[in-house]
Amino acid sequence: MAHKKGTGSTRNGRDSRSQRLGVKRYGGQVVKAGNILIRQRGTKVHPGKNVGRGGDDTLFALIDGVVKFEYKDKSRRQVSVYPAEVSAS
């Protein structure tokens, strides 16, 4: 049995920062114009009504409203933002 501690290699001990991708605002959530909806690589989800697409394929809201995930056809998912319903009070 060794009674000396093994010395750790100084070449280890690093890792890269994760990209923090994914959905940031879910269906039914109220968003403001400019809010990021999805961070993604490639167009896994396409922009729908009132949604813009950034240079890195990030989807963001163009108007204040409510998020809705939809299927444009069988395989093409899209996210849209619809104006929030104004309650009569």
Curated annotation (Swiss-Prot):
Q: Region Disordered: what ranges?
A: 1-24
**Keywords assigned by UniProt, alphabetized:** Ribonucleoprotein, Ribosomal protein
Q: Which domain of life is it from?
A: Bacteria
Q: What is this protein called?
A: Large ribosomal subunit protein bL27
Q: Which family does it belong to?
A: Belongs to the bacterial ribosomal protein bL27 family.
What the entry lists under Pfam families is as follows: Ribosomal_L27
Tell me yes or no: is Ribosomal protein among this UniProt entry's keywords. Answer: yes
Q: Could you state one GO cellular component term attached to this entry?
A: cytosolic large ribosomal subunit
Report the Gene3D superfamilies cross-referenced here. Answer: 2.40.50.100
Q: Which GO terms describe its molecular function?
A: structural constituent of ribosome
Q: Which GO terms describe its biological process?
A: translation
Q: Which InterPro entries match?
A: Ribosomal_bL27 (IPR001684), Ribosomal_bL27_CS (IPR018261)
Question: NCBIfam families in the record, alphabetically?
Answer: L27
User: HAMAP family per the record?
Assistant: Ribosomal_bL27
